[in-house]
Structures are given as C-alpha cells and as structure tokens.
C-alpha cells in the first residue's frame, strides 16, 4: 500500500459508492474503520474489494490474546491487505494476533499487521494524567514500537512526528503508518499531532492516512491529487 490511504469515514455503502465513483478507473488504497465496518458488517469489505481497491481494516483490536487470535482468523478470511491492534494490549496479544492472521490466510500470504502506539488525538498531558504513563509521549511511542517489533508485527500506527525515530530504532522496513495528515489549508479538527503530506514524507512516514482533507473536499479528486503530488514529490 504505497499510495496515500484514504480514510472512508462514512456510515453507509451508498456514501462510499458515491465517493469511489468519482475515482472511476483508479485503484486506491482505502481505510475501512469502525464506523463503516460496524454499520455494514463484512459485506462492506467484499463490495470494496470487488472494485479492486487495497483495504486497511482499522478496527484496533484490544482484548485477551485468545480472543484477538480468534478474531484475526476471521478477519484474515476477508482478504484485506492490512489490519491493526492496540500495542497497549501487550506483546502476547500482538503475537497471538499475528498467529491468527497466519492461520486464517488460506493463500499463505497474510495481511500486514500494525499496532497503534498512541492515538494522534492524545497529547502528552492527556497520556500522563489519564493513562498514568509518566514518561514523555515519544518514549511511550518508542516503547510500544519496540514491543511491536519484538512481537513480529510489520509496523506501527504513529504520528509523523515520531516516524523518523521509529525508523532509526526499528529499521526502514518497519512500517510507520501515520494518520493526522492534513493539507495546509485544512483544519486539524480533533487531532492534535497533525502534519501535511509533504512534511510526513520528509520526516520519515512510510504510509499516510488522509480522511477529511479528501472526503470533505469540494473536489475530492483534486484534493487527492494534491495529496499524491506532495507525497510523491
């Protein structure tokens, strides 16, 4: 998934269909999150796959290892390209998630699996006061990144602001998938650690996830092409 990943932050397939129709003939990388998946079920993945788009299924699993392993066996059968878990679930849970994907992938090629470190809506103050983590935000992200690597995962979800440090620690092949991406003209909304596509590229992101800058644009195709231009410059 080398192209910018478009977050399909919709509730219905009709909205998705209308949006994707604007990109007729284009193969996209898209993210299906909780809102869309829980509103429509697995059929939404099948319908998007029929249009030959790459899918990052963003459900952020976080439960006991056996439960996550069983869930991943099921998700692997959907044929998506990438899934994720919360790194806070721990090394054993992440290992179980990877094992579940391997069991459920009949083709022998499992989806990529990445772990959420800290949400891009989380500030250092929030983390320290609400999660009772007394280190810096960067130290927490780096710890979770290292734990994910040890568990055999393919990468992490992180802010672009932490991507270069993670690359240096865990290698260039370890994915740094970064949400919180906005065009310079757009509002940050509820995300705090936000950067532009160009800056994300320059400071070490391997993949970017872009939602509202594209989906809420007056001309989504033009906005996507602008993101693509900045990302590939």
Curated annotation (Swiss-Prot):
EC assignment: 4.1.1.23
Organism: Listeria monocytogenes serotype 4b (strain CLIP80459)
Active-site residue numbers: 60 (proton donor)
Classification via NCBIfam families: PRK00230.1, pyrF
Quaternary data: Homodimer.
Domain of life: Bacteria
Keywords tagged on the record: Decarboxylase, Lyase, Pyrimidine biosynthesis
PANTHER family: OROTIDINE 5'-PHOSPHATE DECARBOXYLASE
PROSITE patterns, per the entry: OMPDECASE
Family to which the UniProt record says this protein belongs: Belongs to the OMP decarboxylase family. Type 1 subfamily.
Residues annotated as signal peptide: none
Gene Ontology molecular functions: orotidine-5'-phosphate decarboxylase activity
GO terms (BP aspect): 'de novo' pyrimidine nucleobase biosynthetic process; 'de novo' UMP biosynthetic process
Name of the featured protein: Orotidine 5'-phosphate decarboxylase
């Amino acid at each position: 998934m080398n192209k910018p990943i478009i977050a399909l932050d919709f509730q219905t397939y009709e909205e998705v269909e209308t949006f994707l129709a604007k990109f007729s003939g284009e193969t996209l990388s898209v993210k299906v999150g909780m809102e869309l998946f829980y509103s429509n079920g697995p059929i939404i993945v099948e319908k998007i796959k029929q249009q030959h788009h790459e899918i990052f299924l963003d459900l952020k699993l976080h439960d006991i290892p056996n439960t996550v392993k069983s869930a991943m066996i099921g998700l692997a059968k959907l044929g998506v390209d990438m899934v994720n878990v919360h790194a806070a679930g721990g090394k054993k849970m992440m290992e179980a998630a990877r094992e579940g994907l391997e069991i459920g992938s009949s083709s022998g090629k499992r989806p990529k699996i990445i772990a959420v470190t800290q949400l891009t809506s989380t500030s250092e103050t929030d983390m320290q006061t609400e999660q009772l983590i007394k280190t810096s935000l960067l130290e927490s992200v780096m710890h979770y990144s290292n734990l994910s690597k040890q568990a055999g995962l393919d990468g992490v979800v992180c802010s672009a602001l932490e991507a270069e440090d993670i690359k240096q620690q865990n290698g260039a092949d370890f994915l740094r998938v970064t949400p919180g991406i906005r065009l310079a003209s757009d509002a940050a909304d509820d995300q705090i650690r936000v950067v532009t596509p160009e800056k994300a590229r320059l400071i070490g992101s391997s993949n970017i996830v872009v939602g509202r800058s594209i989906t809420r644009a007056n001309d989504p195709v033009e906005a996507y092409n602008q993101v693509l231009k900045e990302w590939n410059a």
